[in-house]
Amino acid sequence: MNTMNHSLIVSTLSVVLFALATSLSVCAADENPESTADSALPSTPNVIMLMSDDQGWGDVGFNGNEVLQTPNLDGMAASGVRFERFYAAAPLCSPTRGSCLTGRYPFRYGILAAHTGGMRVGETTIPEMLKKKDYRTAFFGKWHVGWVKADEVSTRGFYSPPSHHGFDEYFATTSAVPTWNPTVTPQGWDSWGGEEGEPWKGGFPYVQNGVEAKENLDGDDSRVIMDRVIPFVEANKDQPFLATVWFHTPHEPVVAGEEYKKLYPKSGKARQNLYGCITAMDEQIGRLRAKLRELGIEKRTIVFFCSDNGPADGLAKKGVASTGGFHGHKHTMYDGGLLVPACAEWPGVIPPGTSTDARCSTVDYLPTIAGICLGDSAIKKSLPIDGVDLMPLMTGKVDMLDRDLFFGYRRLVQGIDGKAIISGDWKLLQEAKKGGKTRLYDLSKDPYEENDLSAASPERLSVLSQKLAEIEASCQRSRDGADYRY
């Protein structure tokens, strides 16, 4: 048996046992027909969207990693729903991030790779929708869908901060920072960003509501972020709020504090840093979950978690980071680049111990949150939305989703034009590299994409190729202005 599969079975059993041990009150409510989740559903629940950066499917306890310590994420999965097959809209950061906010494929809104654009104000985002119902909205962490400093000049991208897209408050960086001491280039780092020991990218990367932040920026970067999240939650405990928290962890430069590295004495240096910074992030997620319970608002707060794509190329190839056995990694159209760890928690609404292998995606966040907080009518009919409402799936009313999923990553100047479509159990992909081949896989029989059926199944190849072309053409019309008034 595949080692990760064996670990996954063990992890799943532990999740169920944890749920049974810790959720008796929720179960009792479920058994009482007069105390159903639907009848107790808040009309304006709080929404928290958590996202890690470059965390592989196999780099979390609830997906079977027996070494990496993520007790709070494991607790979330146990208390709510664990998504076994949750896909990022693209195999890298910026395109996926936009999909989380818009419910649309990256090829629709024109962010096709990292640092190649910025979020257009014509897009309708989750915070813009929720503000119409008097939600307070805030963003924390890595933005990466536009510059956050007005005077920042670059050959790629443009100024498009969170405040242009519905967020009342923000504490954000444009892109990556070291995961420990985020303002300083770490020891031994010899790539982009700066010289060892010098200021990271020449200065202070965080901007808070338009002003460069210069206080409380030392130590674990996830703690630096959460120190801004907690006051926002406390200040808005009596009114509905949206908190979008996008951690930098575990994106390179991957650095952990000594106390976190010591948790993994038998791991190599690279894995000590990777595991250490993920555990530090998990600790801050636990801090947030504890605060919700302290304030007594956990039952009117839904919390989502996912990664933005698979693990970084180098860390995956060296076996430091894990895709859980799935082929590929970040920057590839294989499932190792697209499948990410994901879960959601809403005590009293999402049954504890829920697990689904239905294929879900980051494009599903907007229609799900709109359905929960506003109703389906809140979505503009003139604006194509590619996601679906996941609440019926998360509450056990349906088992599967009948839809196709499209993924893309394009940087034509480098010959990169990666695309993929999943239709039913079949996946067609065009490799994201110059001269990349077209591949066809039956994921029901070949989840690790080892047996290319493009030559053996020409009819299936033709059908999926046509579907892919139709979706891409629709996205190009959106990207060229069909969805906006000029």
Which residues are covered by each model-predicted region?
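Accessible peptide chain termini
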Residues: 1-2, 486
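Bacterial N-terminal signal peptides that target proteins for export
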Residues: 2-15
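Formylglycine-dependent sulfatase
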Residues: 17-432, 436-439, 443, 447-473, ...
